[in-house]
Amino acid sequence: MTIASFTDLGVHTDLVASLESQSITEPTPIQAECIPLLHAGRDVVGQARTGSGKTLAYTLPLLERIDGKQDRQQSLILAPTRELAEQIASVVQPLAALRNATVALILGGVSYDPQRRALSAGAQIVVGTPGRVLDLLESNSIVADGIRVVVLDEADQMFDIGMAPQV
């Protein structure tokens, strides 16, 4: 089955327009495989090379599930490193804004205060590293009740470097 466009995959028109403005017009194989499954609410384990579009493969369906009118955490994306979390947030933030949603970037090694403010301001999407996310879960700054989508980006790397207990 060949998927010709993001529209064919059921991606919302405002997101498709944003992708097209970045010259992203055709889904990659990982996107064509994962997006329909994620839209259907299925759990997915995806594996593809760096640069294959994995972040968009989970971000586009995730954004369809976010209610921008609810000021509470609704999704959590975990990454093993600060650099990857920052990269993910840079992809998610502009698309989230189209859905009236905000992103809180939660990283160790920096002050808690701005992160707590972003969470209490109602960020719907949390992108972060396991250690700091766990700290903020334990202090109730991140409220897990409303989280409906969890993404483990580079889960194998998190487990390889000993983060399995935190995850």
PLM regions: where:
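Conserved pre-motif I regulatory segment
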Residues: 1-47
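Conserved nucleic-acid-binding Ia/Ib motif block in the N-terminal RecA-like helicase ATPase lobe
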Residues: 8, 13-24, 70-138, 146-149
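Hydrophobic alpha-helix-in-membranes signature
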Residues: 26-28, 35, 60, 74, ...
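Hydrophobic beta-strand scaffold positions of dinucleotide-using enzymes
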Residues: 31, 46, 126-129, 153
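Walker A/P-loop NTP-binding motif
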Residues: 32-44, 55-70, 83-86, 90-95, ...
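Conserved glycine(s) of the Walker
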Residues: 51-53
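SF2 helicase catalytic motif II
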Residues: 134-167
